[in-house]
Amino acid sequence: MARIAGVDLPRDKRIVVALTYIYGIGDATAKKICADAGVSEDIRSKDLTPEDQEKLRAEVDKYRVEGDLRREVSMNIKRLVDIGSYRGIRHRRGLPVRGQNTKNNARTRKGTKRNR
């Protein structure tokens, strides 16, 4: 089982799909990583040679992924909350941040309805 960026990649999936299991790598980035590393997108994770794994690790290390990315996102949200911006207040209150209406919807962010 290939282990890249602290994530065990699924064995039976194509490498371009398996790379998307790493937080911060989507479809387009996975394809770019495979192209830059010179690894075929159609090869399965279990069929990777150790050399291919090293090439992929080197390419993934160029990106901000997993713990570093999660930390950066949480620090960005913390900064908004600390400066008291509108977006920070919405984060603190658990309401939608990007301007969605909340009169009828936004149940996911607001939680279940409380009895009146």
Curated annotation (Swiss-Prot):
Disordered as annotated region, ranges: 92-116
Q: Which Pfam families match?
A: Ribosomal_S13
State the HAMAP family in the record. Ribosomal_uS13 (MF_01315)
Q: Signal peptide span per the entry?
A: none
Say if the entry is tagged with keyword Ribonucleoprotein.
Answer: yes
Q: Which superkingdom?
A: Bacteria
The name of this protein is Small ribosomal subunit protein uS13
Q: Which family does it belong to?
A: Belongs to the universal ribosomal protein uS13 family.
